[in-house]
Amino acid sequence: MRPRRERVLVVDDAANLRELLTVLLDVEDDFEVVGTAADGVQALEKAESLNPDIVLLDLAMPVMDGLQALPGLRERLPLARIVIFSGFEHEALAREALAAGADAYIEKGTSVMQLVARLRQLRRPAGEDSA
């Protein structure tokens, strides 16, 4: 029996990165990108209807950045894993994001294999559902 695929919402202002992450994650047997958003406002609008298991969230975005969106995403998706995926490599920023409710912080320079491995570590245990 094939395990349930983790539903992923990709939030980043760079359209090419959203598309790339969608393609890269969709080819994996255990992930399915269910939606994308270009900023925190769009992410909040889509969060409840898409009900993702994982939110891959950029920090630096126009309109509403990742840190601003984080509390609202956490409120709407209490069981989802929120992963900051950012080009910023500052330890203080990572600590701030984790303190604000993020489950993990991954730098954008990370290889695809490392990103997928980290997302697999965050998978929900069998039998536990976000609905």
For the regions a language model picked out, list residue spans one by one:
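Conserved acidic segment of CheY-like receiver
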Residues: R4-L25
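Alpha4 helix (beta4-alpha4-beta5 surface) of REC/receiver domains from two-component response regulators
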Residues: Q68, E89-I106, T110
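Active-site beta3 strand of CheY-like receiver
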Residues: L50-L56
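Receiver (REC) domain active-site loop signature in two-component systems and cognate sites
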Residues: M61
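Active-site T/S-Asp motif of two-component receiver
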Residues: V10, L57-D58
